[in-house]
Amino acid sequence: MSFQVSVAVNDGPFQKKSVTPNTTIGDLNNDAILIWKDTAIVYDISDESKNFGPTVTLEQLGVTQISMVYIYTTAFPCPSGDLRSIVPAQVRLISQFASAASSIFNGQSSSSAQSAQRTRRVEQDDEGEKSMFSRKLLDSPATFKALSENMFFRLKNEPHKLGYGLPELVERFLAKKDMTYKEFEQMFRSYVEEEVHKEEIIKNNPNSAEAKMFLEAKRNKELIDEQYLHSMTHHPEDMIAVTMLYINLTINGVPVKAFIDSGAQKSIMSMACAERCGLNGLIDRRFQSMARGVGGTEKIEGKIHLCDVKVEDAHFSCPFEVMARREMDLLIGLNVLRKHGCCINLKTSRLEFGNGTTTPFLQSNEIDSHLKEIMALPEEEMQFEDGST
């Protein structure tokens, strides 16, 4: 079965190549001396311990349709003489971008490359410990006790580091974090016995329905891990919380930061914002009702039928439902966006109005400042839809 894979030669641009699992390295490039797959070297002609050559197939190198393949040939300079000193330019750029993005958005001092390396080390450590789960371990009280004590200490102090390779064990532990060591030892023995039982079924009766179920779960986890690593390496921006869309505007001379939400049917103003802008007396309380949405049900205190909103140098008349909620000052919903022919231009990061007025979306630091200072919210309450602060 053929599939397409992304291939870059000597730090050149990626090209899509139609290949099959039996496609050889010689078919791709007969002068290949070093090949990276994603973030690891999988082909090194100088490695005498392995029989590398043009006849090696992509299947032998573990190349799949989501793999990124970097090929280096005899024409690529290697001043150090060590082929393994060659690192793909794309990987270096991704690491630099991820490091900068991590520092800006998450305030982390370490680079994403170091983070990915730590993730791989944790994964390898956890898988190494998991590979120790055997009948021999269960039959050796001293060895089992030493391992269970080590696991108990790590789960008490750094469960997140075990969550990648041993998620089920971490989940069981966190369900009862205050358990004693004796209780943990019993739970850990039960967990190890289950894992050993699965491996024994797969080994002794691979064609059984139970074995096939275990194998499928194992393959799915491997695929998830591969996709996660691929995403961390080639799409690090996906790991950064997206900044929600806010704009600056003015109501009655009072500056307001408005949240742009094209998924909201109506536009909403908080009672605090209405009072701050001197609009409290214009609330028509005959329009009291209940609003139902993803966040639950909230009471609408009334409606402001016509509110003059100034964006840049233009004025727009907007209706607003008024709520007592304080988590959001002002929400511009679809009714106002459609009324004024607005376009959310993510390419230029601006909100464009039908009359030609445009205004930029705010940066994350401006939004944080708004939530803390204007809304007077504690920092721990500043949570966006994805749960990030």
Curated annotation (Swiss-Prot):
- Tissues of expression: Expressed in most tissues.
* EC numbers for this chain: 3.4.23.-
Per the record, the similarity remark reads: Belongs to the DDI1 family.
Q: Which GO terms describe its biological process?
A: negative regulation of synapse assembly; proteolysis
Chain positions covered by the region annotation Disordered: 109-132
Q: What does this protein do?
A: Aspartic protease. Required for the cleavage and activation of transcription factors such as isoform a of the transcription factor skn-1, which in turn regulates the expression of proteasomal subunits such as rpt-3. Plays a key role in the degradation of the potassium channel slo-1, perhaps acting directly, in cleaving slo-1 upstream of the ER-associated degradation pathway (ERAD), and also indirectly, via activation of the transcription factor skn-1, which mediates proteasomal homeostasis.
InterPro entries to which the protein is assigned, alphabetical: Peptidase_aspartic_DDI1-type, Peptidase_aspartic_dom_sf
Which branch of life, at top level? Answer: Eukaryota
Compartment list? Cytoplasm; Nucleus
Catalytic residues in the record: 261
**What keywords are assigned to this protein?**
Aspartyl protease, Cytoplasm, Hydrolase, Nucleus, Protease
Name of the protein this chain belongs to: Protein DDI1 homolog 1
GO cellular component annotations of the record = cytoplasm; nucleus
Enzyme class, one word?
A: hydrolase
